[in-house]
Amino acid sequence: MSNVFDSKSFLKTVTSQPGVYRMYDAGGTVIYVGKAKDLKKRLSSYFRGNLGSRKTEALVALIEQIDVTVTHTETEALLLEHNYIKLYQPRYNVLLRDDKSYPYIFLSADHHPRLASHRGAKHAKGEYFGPFPNGYAVRETLSLLQKIFPVRQCENSVYRNRSRPCLQYQIGRCLGPCVEGLVTEEEYARQIDYVRLFLSGKDDQVLNQLVARMEQASGDLRFEEAGRLRDQIQAVRRVTEKQFVSNQGDDMDVIGVSFDSGMACLHVLFIRQGKVLGSRSYFPKVPGGTELAEVVQTFVGQFYLQGSQARTLPSDILIDFTLPEKDLLAASLTALSGRRVSIQSKPRGDRARYLKLARTNAATALITRLAQHSTIHQRLAALAQTLKLPAIGRMECFDISHTMGEQTVASCVVFDANGPLRSEYRRYNISGITPGDDYAAMNQVLRRRYGKAIEESKIPDVIVIDGGKGQLAQAKEVFAQLDVTWDKSHPLLLGVAKGTDRKAGLETLFLEPEGEGFSLPPDSPALHVIQHIRDDSHNHAITGHRNKRAKVKNTSALETIEGIGPKRRQMLLKYMGGLQPLINASKEEIARVPGISTALAEKIFYALKH
């Protein structure tokens, strides 16, 4: 127990109402957030003789201050608790690290609606179908829809400026509503209705309508149309036969749980209108000594009560665990969504099959993750031994990418004890240096990265510099000149030079810019982790460089034209649908762009043609 914190005096001031409490350590950092129906009773339990777990003992020993927020109801306390957990990320709370919004399929409200992938706030007018577990599931579904229902998926800027149909029309994946006369308004609207029904899980209605139209066309001797409808019917049937579908048209999430070796996996199946849209495995950060009940309870709360997750609430949640506060959580979700949300742990029939499937997936994913962590732990231990370090808890690696000195981008990749920490990967646009000067680029990125205050937990044990002696010398110089409050002598700087023919396994490692380096055997686990972080850093840098180069390529031709500033440049590209359509456009078409006069259109036309 803390020698500074006076628990007796503090408890005299605490009310017995519901609310949320935040515990701070000596540095003023929030280390735990909790909620209580009775704050006084709950907080008193932390300062009794027998705390019941090592985790709680360790937590209480660090307490220097406790802040309390009183709420009207326990439901309010639950919502506030999860908002605070998201805000402060306390070390003693179970943390859901993946907090990305989910993608949807968007059907626009345009005159000729389009299909698209959407993620984020739902500002655009139209219909949203989902959520899907990831972007891949959305792309696969859009590709499938395009083959069955040839509805446009192009941006409005492209659609509005076409005078002839694109390749999608030529290969039968779009009806070509952009060009007058290719498809009737009635037929396009009918295909949109089919898409809407299909995404709503009403496959039978789609098939019934298609069959009726096919029979009508056949009876009227319109055999070519009947043949197209037959092919469309077969495509829909092939898709629906492959799906594991619930007869009830359920709208639910199914959560399977697996827990082993201090690691938890919660696998979520997303089911909408009876169809499995996909699934995703989650591995929340679990403090040592945490009970499974707390892990599951906290995960479910964070998953549905934090941020964007609240917009994706299903009608039912099936979970492979009896939650201690199931009724409270269900009441909170019901209040949040404005409709009844139920939580079930012992379903029957098809729902029991779904739960078994989620449980199996959770167990399989956990076995895979444990094996991966075992491998990365072994590799980091081997590298620590090679570098004569007690342990390696965090590594960072830097690489530079450019083309002939242009669009230079530096990348920083982060590994922790469990491998790649992708949420902390960063790219830096490098400017103000001589083109092609990799040393100056490395010098700049290291100063930007480390020339500021850094949390103690984020100071790397090893910094890998891709480039060998010269780049390592730059890193040593930067660190010698840093004027910072954190211990700049802590990170070990390691240079990595590729072999003469740049083959993996022939790398030379340098701890100092002078003298000979050393090599590790090709089968060395220590070398493997260096190769892993080096390759990730290279890929991250080159991807950023290519994106930057493509952006410049699309605007550089316009930048040379007098009278075309950033706003007009953006308007031209957006209205015409990109640089190539603009290059192919006539003077009259360019003059239709808002803000572009006939004289300026002529100037643009000749500048792009010559």
Curated annotation (Swiss-Prot):
Q: Does the keyword DNA damage apply?
A: yes
Annotated Gene Ontology cellular component terms: cytoplasm; excinuclease repair complex
Provide the GIY-YIG domain boundaries.
Answer: 16-94
Q: InterPro entries this protein is in?
A: GIY-YIG_endonuc, GIY-YIG_endonuc_sf, GIY-YIG_UvrC_Cho, Hlx-hairpin-Hlx_DNA-bd_motif, RuvA_2-like, UVR_dom, UVR_dom_sf, UvrABC_protein_C
Give me any GO biological process, just one.
Answer: nucleotide-excision repair
Principal place where this protein is found?
cytoplasm
* CDD domains named among the record's database cross-references: GIY-YIG_UvrC_Cho (cd10434)
What UniProt keywords apply to this chain's record, in alphabetical order?
Cytoplasm, DNA damage, DNA excision, DNA repair, Excision nuclease, SOS response
UVR domain location, by residue?
A: 204-239
The keyword tRNA-binding belongs to this UniProt entry's keyword annotation: no
Q: Which Pfam families match?
A: GIY-YIG, HHH_5, UVR, UvrC_RNaseH, UvrC_RNaseH_dom
Q: Where is this gene product found?
A: Cytoplasm
Citing just one GO molecular function, the answer is: DNA binding
Name the family the entry cites.
Answer: Belongs to the UvrC family.
NCBIfam families assigned:
PRK00558.1-5 (NF001824), uvrC (TIGR00194)
What is its biological role?
Answer: The UvrABC repair system catalyzes the recognition and processing of DNA lesions. UvrC both incises the 5' and 3' sides of the lesion. The N-terminal half is responsible for the 3' incision and the C-terminal half is responsible for the 5' incision.
Binding partners and assembly: Interacts with UvrB in an incision complex.
The protein depicted here goes by the name UvrABC system protein C
